[in-house]
Design a protein with these regions (language model features):
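Glycoside hydrolase catalytic-domain context in secreted enzymes
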Residues: 1-212
Length: 212
């Protein structure tokens, strides 16, 4: 996946200098290999810390949510953003703002739980904190990435009313109040149309209604 930095420790944690060197080499290689010298946007996982060996590791989002303190979460995200930026990572694949209504879902720990407002507040706080350091926030997975029964990325037949009242609201706040500069589409389909090419979600709602 061009543009995705994946930390490989090779048996030991990498220092900031080693991570930066690896990313710079990747950027140089990709830039030199295309006719327009276009560099990639380096992105990486940063759910509860920048993804390299000596970066700060914070609690999982489900634990952060238990603080009910969006200001503290914004400060945490600011630290994560700094540690991403110093290594050359310019896009963080976080926050996960899928509202969990069935804790059998294996990715529940990555979320802020079952409450719509809490998800929205925490997600927007993460977006603001990351982007203070020039790191693009990526709320995901847009939208309704899990289904009842705990099945990951399964077909969603959720009604539009429930989508708008529950599953879309955290994303809306991430865009309007968090200023999120990117969004990751969900892997599943909604109402028979894959979310990654769902015009109603990506154009009518995300762009036209929310102004993304």
């Amino acid at each position: 996946n061009i543009g995705h930095f994946l930390h490989e420790s090779k048996g030991k944690p990498l220092s900031p200098e080693e991570v930066t060197e690896a990313i710079n080499n990747e950027i140089r290689c990709i830039s030199e290999s295309n006719s327009h010298s276009i560099p990639p946007i380096e992105h990486g996982e940063a759910l509860h810390g920048a993804q390299w060996g000596m970066a700060t590791c914070f609690p999982q989002p489900i634990a952060m949510a238990s603080m009910f303190d969006s200001e503290a979460v914004e400060e945490i995200a600011e630290v994560i953003g700094k540690e991403c930026a110093v290594a050359g990572v310019r896009q963080a694949l976080t926050p996960v703002v899928n509202v969990v209504r069935d804790c059998r879902w294996g990715r529940t720990v990555e979320t802020f739980g079952e409450d719509v407002l809490l998800n929205a507040d925490m997600g927007a706080a993460v977006c603001r904190g990351l982007q203070k350091n020039g790191v693009i926030a990526t709320p995901k997975h847009f939208a309704d990435n899990y289904s009842y029964g705990g099945r990951d990325s399964n077909v969603s037949n959720t009604s539009e009313r429930t989508m708008r009242e529950v599953y879309l609201r955290p994303f809306e706040k991430c865009i309007k109040e968090g200023g999120a500069m990117s969004v990751m589409a969900a892997y599943n389909s909604w109402d028979g149309v894959p979310c990654s090419c769902n015009k109603y979600l990506l154009t009518d709602i995300l762009r036209n209604e929310w102004g993304f």
